[in-house]
Each structure stands twice: as structure tokens, then as C-alpha cells.
């Protein structure tokens, strides 16, 4: 390989500095990538991979600079970092190598402008670990910066709420922890703090390492001062209901398990906000239900206000429709990358504040969650007086200010405008003089103004006679200049250049004026977001007929005609079967039995979701709801192997159960669905019973515990705080009909084979399973003497005593076969696999 060219040497030196980035290297009108970057970019963006310097065969690809944002955005979405190397000199004015510098590094956590979703916060987080963990996170687009201290489990739970796009650390995290973090985000970067970067002011010394690390990284990527990130706010998650990552996932609060998006989530129901700030805040409220009764009731009162005043809500929604993202606009003003178009959007937003102020004037005592709403009239007046409504995005091309705002702008604009009029008149005169109707006057940055005549019209034209000087030859035309044209050019271009420079200077002054209102702007953005969330809650409550819950000062949970907020929206109106739930100090555990597909999981989820909705300040889907303040909600629902950490379904189940049993209090809610399915019948039964007893005797948490172990129903006789309930179903003409109604007492049958029939398992398997079930049930009755007693609490849960070992082994094998049938995943079984499974069962019986 020959020695690289000076330009490639420049590229390689830059790439050495930014090894973890894809380097976008500016060459004229393109950004070019080389070597591995080119191969990776071409693959990810599906663009053409070519070769530069055939002797060295260097892989190369490129994208036009004017459309680069689209390509960069796609790379960022895939988790890559992009370093932008710009030409710092005009190639036409430089002899030799053009100076280039990396001016910005774009990463998933530091994206700004319109590359990020307006309805979601775009957080970047840092983790520091000494005795415990310090977590700091920021949304660069708004300047928000928060910090807290936690243990490892709390840190992971908080990360799942924050959901950062990128995590920074300067310590070596163990592999197990990294794997857990990667369940939240794949982008984990190692970075060392540089003393030249911004340090945190006014932050407790124990918090500074995490905050300084985060600020240093952001400043490193943005390559400019971070004036807009001016305060680190310390908070404690204990002020909110604890929802661990399992609960958020299982309850599908903001992301669905199946599709990994908002569809089918609680967030999808409360997606009626009118502003980006509101949409971001409602997601935060869903994931952080309140623990303070007064704060909860203040939100409820705000929702009730809008419920009782339809016209008020309608007018507010109409006003909010015209409000842009004030929070991020303020962030751009502080950061220094605000455009004239941004300030016009800010003006439109401020225009709505007097109307909002007027609407709420009589209701200050109700909307206590708001600080003073300020119309910011001086700021609005300045923006209205100065900016053209159609102001451009670029602040260097002029066309920003209204006529009459500045005398110098008006004079230069007049000179420039008259110059263009003179050009139009000259074009008409030259067409008349030469007789060439297609003659035109054009402009480019290389030659300035010129007269262009097609070659066909030049055949019989004596250009010298008209005083034309040839300047450029094209394939089908010639370009000329005249003395008169060059004289006017200097006047016209001089006015235009002065005008653009003056408008740029005035815009910087206007931006600095807006900066003086930043704190107030940010406060009004928060006010708007809160109002938007409250009217949103009211809109949803009205649409779906929700009611105002009572936040009890007791431990009573009493919900009548409860409905699942998401499931009911995909059903025909009035088709959803509502159910009650009443738990208190005397009855705090429901043991739930019923067939598969009968609605046990839906029932448990709806109780948890209604509790969350009540504590986040929303109304709830019920006819009556008295809800205690739960400090935590724990769930164990569904079955899925943890492929990341290599854990089986059963191990995941046990870890989630352990999390609840270790951390729950008598003020918590526990949802356990089919604990013990992933092991043998007796192991599973023993574990399920021991967990119920532990919750009953040691914790006292409100608990919904569904099971297929019918032996457990007799616990009602020995545990005072436990009641049996079941989801009803009935057989009719050999068919199973799900009633979806929760009734007192235990169910008599699981109807597993009926469910298999509904799933259209092969008829041969259904028939044979029925025969086996009859045989197993008969043998079970004989073995138990037709009794059905639970394992006594004093019994060793992991040993089975039996006088006849051989008889025990035979019966145990029967249980294993039954369990094997129960464990068949019907949804994932093909007909061929079903037949093979049947053959396996028959072989075990023989």
C-alpha cells in the first residue's frame, strides 16, 4: 500500500481521535466515510459502497450535506455515534489542504433539534459507584438535570423509569450488572472526566462525581459551553410509588410486551395531551405515582374541575393546540442554537397565555399544582414587533425582521429590492436590444451576475457590438458580463451582504433579550404541561366513563365494577364484564382459581392499574373506588426465559417473587400469577403455599394470587386473611363458556382440555388427554381416599412422606405427566409437534 494522500492523512488523524464514532468527513457538498466506517455506514443506511484510490482500494461512501440529517438520525436510532468534521475554510480561497475540525459529536443521548421525538424526553445518564450508586441524568434539549443516590436494585428500577438513550460511566461495572443495564439501553460508554469541562456548582460533594461526569461528556460532545444546564436538582424516589422494572413491564405501563411500543399500554389511553410538554409529563406521571395524599387529591380536584366544566376544557384544549414546545424552545435559546422560526413558534405560544390565564382566573384555588401563570407580555410584544411570521430557519440568510422594526434594515432592504428591480428592467431591455427573447440574467457565487444566451441564438448575434464580454462557456449556452452590470453588482451585493450581516446581529440581540426571560419561560412550560395533563385526564375520564376515586386514609381497597382500562377499549361497548375487589385488614389475600383464558390475569392487572391511575391523579374505570396509598406494587405475571442473562423461566419467576417477598410491606400490593409452573407439581405446590403463608403471616400485603393448584383452596380454612375467589365458566353441550365474572369460592375444574380444544389442538390429542385425565383423577381419588387436603403449614415443603415408596413413585409419575400436559405451549405447537408430544406422553405411560 502506498503512502496516504495529505487529505487521507488528515482523515486518519481525526479518526484516531474519535475511534468510537462514525466520522462524517466534509468534502465539498458531501460527507464522506472511509475504511470500516464506510462499510458499516453503507450496510446500515443501505447506500452504495464504492472505492477511492484504486491503487489502495479504500472503501468509501457518502451522503449529501444538505440531507445528512436524515442519515445521521438513522444511525443514531441504531445506537451509533457520529462525529461531524467540517471544512473550516473556503476551498476556493485556500491553496493546499483545507483545514477541517470535528465540530460536534452526535450520540443517542445528546441529540438535539428535530432528530428526537417531541413527545418523549431524551435522557442521557451517568452512573457512579462508591458505597452506593449515584445516578445523574439530563435531557440536553431542555437543560433538565436531576441526580439521586440509590442501592443497585433501586438504581436499576430508576433507570427503567428514566429510560435513558445512553449511559456514561467511568468505572468498571461487573458483567451481571451490565447485562441488567442492557435490558434498558444498549448504549453504554466509558468516559473519563476532564478538568477543563464544566463542573457542577451547588451540588453535594457526594453527588459531584456523577454530575461532573455527565456534564463533562455532554460538553465534550457538544464542544461548547452548557449555559442551559444551570441547575442539578436532587430528588429521592421514595416520594413516589415504587414500581420495579418487572411491574412496569408486566403491567405494560408505557411499552407493550409483544410489540415494544405504546400500542396496548396505559400510556396509549392517556395519550390525549395537546402539547409536547404534556405528553412527556404524562409518561412521567404514569411511571411515578404519588405517595402524598394531598398532592394526589389536588390532581383529582383539577380533573374534576375540567369534568364539571366542559366548555372550559374545550376552550383550554383549543388554546393548547396552538402552543409549541416552550420547554425545548427555551433550551435552544439558552444553548444558542435557536432559529428565527423557533422564536416565531415561541411568539405563537405566548399568544395563548392571556387566554389560558383568563380561563383559569376563577379557579386558582382548584389548580393548586400551578405556580403563577404569567403571560410574559413584554416578551410577546417584542417578538410580535420584530419577527416576520414566515421567518426562515437559517439566521444568516436574512428575511427575519419586519419592515419598520429597524431603520437601517429598511434602508438596506430598499437598496437591495431596487437593485433586483433594476436587474429585471435590464433583462427586458437586453432582450429587446438583442432580439433574443430567451436571454436571462442569472447569478452564482463564482461569477456574480451574468447574461446568459443559448448557443442557438448566438449564431447570428455579434456580441461584441453589444459590449458583451464572454465569461463562461456551457454545453448549450454562453455567459457574458458588461461594465454596467458589474457596476450595479457591487451596489446590489453590497446592500444584500450588509443587510444579512445586520439582521444576524439584530437576531443575536433579540436572542439575548429572550434569555432574560428564561426562568419564567421554563416555569410557564411546566404550568402548561401540568394543565395539559389534567385536561387530558378529564378528556379520557369523560370518554371512557371513569369516576373520581376516594383516597382512603385506611388500608381498605374497595373497587366496584372495575374494568381493565386498555382491554375494554378493544371490545364492543358494554361487552366488558366488570368485577369487584374488596381487600382490607381482615381479608387481604385473594386466592384466585379458574380456567385458562377465563380472565384471571386481566382481573389482577386491572386492580393494579386502577391503583396506579388513582395515585397518579387520574380517574379510574369503575363505578366506585376507595383506594389506599400503596407504597409499592410487585408483579409476577407471565413466563419468559431471560435470554440476556441465560436464566430459565422458573429462575426468572423465583427472582421476581424474591424481589416482592423481600421488599413488600403491609402497604404494598402483590400480584402473583401461577407461581410454581416451571417445576414439578409438588415443588410448585409447596413453593406456592409457602409464599402465601409468608405473605399472610410475615408481610400482610394486599395480594392477588392466581393458581392452578386446587389443593391450595383449603388454605382459606387456616389463614384468616385469605379468601377464595374464582373466575366463572360453565360447560354447555360439551363446550366451555367463559363468563369472566369473579365469584366467591374456588372453581371445581381447570378446564385445561377444553381450552386446548378451543385452541384447535388435534382431535386425537384432545381425546387421548381426556382419557388420561379421567384415569389420573380416578387414581388421585383412590390415593387420597377421596379427600383433598392441603399440605399442613408445619409440613416440610420439599419432602413427600409416603409409606409405600413404589406407590408414591407411580403417583408422582402421574403428576409429572399431568404437569407435562399442562405445560404444553399451545400457541407455539404445530400439528406435527403435537403428535410427537402425544407419542412422548404415551411412551411415559407405558
From Swiss-Prot:
Q: Name one Pfam family in it.
A: MutS_V
Identify the gene encoding this protein: mutS
Q: Which UniProt keywords apply?
A: ATP-binding, DNA damage, DNA repair, DNA-binding, Nucleotide-binding
Where do the coiled-coil regions begin and end? none
The name this protein carries in UniProt is: DNA mismatch repair protein MutS
Family statement drawn from the similarity comment of this UniProt entry = Belongs to the DNA mismatch repair MutS family.
Q: Which GO terms describe its cellular component?
A: cytosol
Q: Where does ATP bind?
A: 594-601
* Origin species: Macrococcus caseolyticus (strain JCSC5402)
Highest taxon, organism lineage: Bacteria
HAMAP family tied to this protein:
MutS
For this protein, the record's CDD domains field holds: ABC_MutS1
Amino acid at each position: 500500500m502506498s503512502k496516504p494522500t495529505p487529505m487521507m492523512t488528515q482523515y486518519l488523524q481525526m479518526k484516531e481521535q474519535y475511534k468510537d464514532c462514525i466520522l462524517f468527513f466534509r468534502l465539498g457538498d458531501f460527507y464522506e466515510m472511509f475504511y470500516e466506517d464506510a462499510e458499516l455506514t453503507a450496510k446500515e443506511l443501505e447506500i452504495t459502497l464504492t472505492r477511492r484510490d484504486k491503487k489502495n482500494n479504500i472503501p468509501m461512501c457518502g451522503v449529501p450535506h444538505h440531507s445528512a440529517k436524515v442519515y445521521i438520525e438513522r444511525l443514531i436510532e441504531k445506537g451509533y455515534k457520529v462525529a461531524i468534521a467540517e471544512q473550516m475554510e473556503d476551498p476556493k480561497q485556500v491553496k493546499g489542504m483545507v483545514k477541517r475540525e470535528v465540530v460536534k459529536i452526535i450520540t443517542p443521548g445528546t441529540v438535539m433539534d428535530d432528530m428526537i421525538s417531541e413527545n418523549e424526553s431524551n435522557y442521557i445518564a451517568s452512573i457512579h459507584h462508591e458505597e452506593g450508586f449515584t445516578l445523574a441524568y439530563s435531557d440536553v434539549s431542555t437543560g433538565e438535570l436531576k441526580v439521586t443516590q440509590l442501592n443497585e436494585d433501586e438504581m436499576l428500577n430508576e433507570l427503567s423509569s428514566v429510560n435513558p438513550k445512553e449511559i456514561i460511566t467511568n468505572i468498571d461495572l461487573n458483567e451481571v450488572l451490565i447485562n441488567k443495564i442492557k435490558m434498558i439501553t444498549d448504549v453504554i460508554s466509558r468516559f473519563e472526566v476532564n478538568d477543563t469541562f464544566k463542573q457542577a456548582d451547588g451540588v453535594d460533594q457526594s453527588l459531584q462525581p456523577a454530575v461532573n461526569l455527565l456534564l463533562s461528556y455532554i460538553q465534550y460532545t457538544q464542544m461548547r459551553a452548557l449555559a442551559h444546564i444551570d441547575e442539578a436538582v436532587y430528588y429521592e424516589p421514595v416520594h413516589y410509588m415504587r414500581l420495579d422494572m418487572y411491574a412496569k413491564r408486566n403491567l405494560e405501563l408505557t411499552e407493550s410486551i409483544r410489540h415494544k411500543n405504546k400500542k396496548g399500554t396505559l400510556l396509549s389511553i392517556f395519550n390525549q395531551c395537546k402539547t409536547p410538554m404534556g405528553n412527556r409529563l404524562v409518561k412521567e406521571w404514569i411511571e411515578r405515582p404519588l405517595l402524598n395524599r394531598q398532592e394526589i387529591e389536588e390532581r383529582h380536584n383539577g380533573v374534576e374541575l375540567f369534568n364539571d366544566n366542559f366548555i372550559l376544557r374545550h376552550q383550554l384544549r383549543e388554546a393548547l393546540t396552538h402552543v409549541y414546545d416552550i420547554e425545548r424552545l427555551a433550551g435552544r435559546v439558552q444553548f444558542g442554537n435557536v432559529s428565527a422560526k423557533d422564536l416565531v413558534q415561541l411568539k405563537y405560544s405566548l399568544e395563548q397565555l392571556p387566554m389560558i390565564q383568563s380561563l383559569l382566573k376563577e379557579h386558582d384555588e382548584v389548580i393548586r399544582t400551578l405556580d403563577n401563570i404569567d403571560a410574559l407580555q413584554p416578551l410577546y410584544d417584542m417578538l410580535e414587533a420584530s419577527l416576520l411570521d414566515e421567518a426562515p430557519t437559517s439566521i444568516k440568510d436574512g428575511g427575519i425582521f419586519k419592515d419598520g422594526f429597524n431603520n437601517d434594515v429598511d434602508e438596506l432592504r430598499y437598496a437591495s429590492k431596487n437593485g433586483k428591480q433594476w436587474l429585471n428592467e435590464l433583462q427586458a431591455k437586453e432582450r429587446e436590444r438583442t432580439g433574443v427573447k430567451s436571454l436571462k440574467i442569472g447569478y452564482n457565487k463564482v461569477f456574480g451576475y451574468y447574461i446568459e444566451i443559448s448557443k442557438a441564438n448566438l449564431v447570428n448575434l455579434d456580441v461584441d457590438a453589444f459590449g458583451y464580454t464572454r465569461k463562461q462557456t456551457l454545453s448549450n449556452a454562453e455567459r457574458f458580463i458588461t461594465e454596467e452590470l458589474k457596476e450595479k453588482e457591487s451596489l446590489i451585493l453590497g446592500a444584500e451582504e450588509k443587510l444579512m450581516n445586520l439582521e444576524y446581529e439584530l437576531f443575536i440581540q433579540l436572542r439575548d433579550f429572550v434569555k432574560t426571560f428564561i426562568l419564567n419561560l421554563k416555569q410557564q412550560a411546566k404550568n402548561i404541561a401540568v394543565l395539559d395533563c389534567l385536561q387530558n385526564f378529564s378528556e379520557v375520564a369523560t370518554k371512557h366513563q371513569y369516576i373520581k376515586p376516594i383516597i382512603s386514609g385506611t388500608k381498605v381497597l374497595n373497587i366496584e365494577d372495575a374494568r381493565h382500562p386498555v382491554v375494554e377499549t378493544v371490545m364492543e361497548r358494554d361487552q366488558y364484564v366488570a368485577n369487584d375487589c374488596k381487600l382490607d385488614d381482615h381479608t387481604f389475600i385473594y386466592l384466585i382459581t379458574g380456567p385458562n383464558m377465563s380472565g384471571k390475569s386481566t382481573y389482577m392487572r386491572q386492580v393494579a392499574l386502577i391503583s396506579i391511575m388513582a395515585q397518579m391523579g387520574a380517574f379510574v374505570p369503575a363505578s366506585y373506588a376507595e383506594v389506599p396509598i400503596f407504597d409499592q406494587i410487585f408483579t409476577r405475571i407471565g413466563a419468559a426465559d431471560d435470554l440476556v442473562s441465560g436464566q430459565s423461566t422458573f429462575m426468572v419467576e423465583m427472582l421476581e417473587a424474591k424481589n416482592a417477598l423481600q421488599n413488600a410491606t403491609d402497604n404494598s400490593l402483590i400480584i402473583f400469577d401461577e407461581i410454581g409452573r416451571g417445576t414439578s407439581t409438588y415443588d410448585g405446590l409447596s413453593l406456592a403455599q409457602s409464599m402465601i403463608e409468608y405473605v399472610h403471616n410475615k408481610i400482610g400485603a394486599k395480594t392477588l394470587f392466581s393458581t392452578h393448584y386446587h389443593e391450595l383452596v383449603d388454605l382459606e380454612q387456616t389463614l384468616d386473611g385469605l379468601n377464595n375467589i374464582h373466575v366463572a365458566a360453565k360447560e354447555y353441550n360439551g363446550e366451555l363458556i367463559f363468563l369472566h365474572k369473579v365469584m366467591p369460592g374456588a372453581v371445581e375444574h381447570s378446564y385445561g382440555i377444553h381450552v386446548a380444544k378451543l385452541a384447535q389442538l388435534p382431535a386425537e390429542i384432545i381425546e387421548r388427554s381426556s382419557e388420561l385425565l379421567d384415569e389420573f383423577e380416578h387414581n388421585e381419588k383412590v390415593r387420597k381416599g377421596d379427600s383433598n387436603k392441603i399440605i399442613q403449614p408445619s409440613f416440610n415443603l420439599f419432602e413427600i412422606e409416603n409409606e409405600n415408596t413404589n406407590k408414591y413413585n407411580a403417583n408422582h409419575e402421574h403428576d409429572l405427566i399431568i404437569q407435562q400436559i399442562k405445560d404444553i405451549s399451545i400457541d407455539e405447537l404445530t400439528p406435527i409437534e403435537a403428535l410427537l408430544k402425544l407419542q412422548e406422553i404415551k411412551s411415559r405411560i407405558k
